[in-house]
């Protein structure tokens, strides 16, 4: 809710979330903190978290113990590290960026303020695109808890003209 207070002075035209309940709950908390009572919202599966395939639902620390640190870091932070029956970050990029370009970017270019609530990996994929991050550097791209990224777009620009980071201290929950 404290993070939402950083948005009090912003008028949003629309919100986008993934189709997963966690982002709906986060959006509700942000809107409450910003004292926004209604906002048109679009739920899009293209913004969903990475599919971890056979690892979905597993405790990440148990997985790390089972597969070792190198494979664990490859899965969590690698660009094209395979997961059995799941997605790589490259796969997430391949669905998030086209959705952004066709659905969200035109609104930004029309001067709308868009609130996007997504997951760590879908945001990391979008950051790769917006911030021109090379594949080799993706392991170091983080979206920490308690931060909002604010990208500014001009009507003729396909990429942001400015990026700000807003943050509050939030105690991370061990997930």
Which residues make up each language-model segment?
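Active-site-adjacent alpha-helix immediately C-terminal to a catalytic or transition-state-stabilizing loop
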Residues: 24, 98-159
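Phosphate-handling substructures
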Residues: 32-97, 142
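Active-site-proximal alpha-helix that buttresses catalytic centers in soluble enzyme cores
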Residues: 1-38, 66, 84-96, 139, ...
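Short catalytic/ligand-binding loop motif for oxyanion handling, primarily in non-cytosolic enzymes
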Residues: 23-26, 50-53, 82-83, 123-126
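Short, well-ordered beta-to-alpha junction loops that form the rim of enzyme active sites
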Residues: 17-20, 46, 77, 112-113, ...
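Conserved histidine-centered catalytic loops in small-molecule metabolism enzymes
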Residues: 10-46, 71-73, 130-131, 152-175
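Structured helix-beta-strand junction loops
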Residues: 10, 66, 78, 110-111
């Amino acid at each position: 809710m404290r993070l939402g207070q950083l948005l009090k002075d912003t008028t949003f035209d629309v919100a986008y979330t993934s189709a997963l309940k966690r982002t709906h709950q986060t959006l509700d908390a942000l809107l409450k903190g910003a004292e926004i009572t209604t906002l048109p919202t679009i739920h899009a599966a293209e913004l969903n978290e990475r599919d971890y395939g056979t690892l979905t639902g597993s405790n990440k620390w148990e997985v790390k113990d089972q597969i070792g640190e190198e494979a664990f870091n490859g899965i969590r932070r690698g660009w094209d590290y395979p997961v059995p029956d799941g997605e790589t970050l490259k796969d997430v990029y391949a669905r998030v960026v086209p959705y952004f370009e066709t659905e969200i970017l035109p609104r930004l270019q029309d001067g709308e303020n868009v609130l996007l609530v997504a997951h760590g990996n879908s945001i990391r994929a979008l950051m790769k695109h917006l911030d021109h991050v090379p594949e080799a550097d993706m392991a170091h791209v983080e979206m920490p808890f308690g931060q909002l990224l604010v990208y500014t777009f001009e009507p003729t620009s396909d990429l942001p003209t400015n990026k700000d980071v807003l943050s509050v201290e939030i105690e991370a929950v061990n997930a």
